[in-house]
Amino acid sequence: MRMKDQFGNITLHNADCMDILRDMADNSFDLAIVDPPYFDGPNKLGYYGASKSSKGVKRPFYEVKHWTIPENDYFVELMRVSKAQIIWGCNYFRFPFGAGRIVWDKVNGRSSFSDCEIAYCSLIDTVRLFAFMWNGMCQGKSVAEGRIQQGNKALNERRI
């Protein structure tokens, strides 16, 4: 089922992206920023863990109806319809992306999460690194801030 909503000059599509991309003209928009699925874990039974936490709290059940890892035709279509692209997780796909890379250092220390995320960026021919803390609830605009208390008005005023 295809649904479309218009908000000013922004159009939101709720449909299979391949159907939408095939219908679009070449260079339809200036920049595509995407983070496609890169592994099939959510399709596997029990991927999201046990039905109860170690404390006995019941976890919500999220049914995964469709989780498809894109093939090369997705990237071909995406590059056809967009003038520039930023594609997160480019290191997981067998596609001949150009040289430009963005490396996000998540400043997450010793955790089970990846230390970095890598994106292809067609706007550059080099590698750019930026650090932005992301480790579950520890998020920040500055590495020096450490854990951010979301309701901390004084800290938010200092940022402005």
Ranges and model annotations:
Residues 1-33:
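SAM-dependent nucleic-acid methyltransferase catalytic core
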Residues 13-14, 67-71:
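A conditional alpha-helix N-cap/helix-loop micro-motif detector
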Residues 70-77, 81:
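Short, conserved SAM-binding segment of the class I
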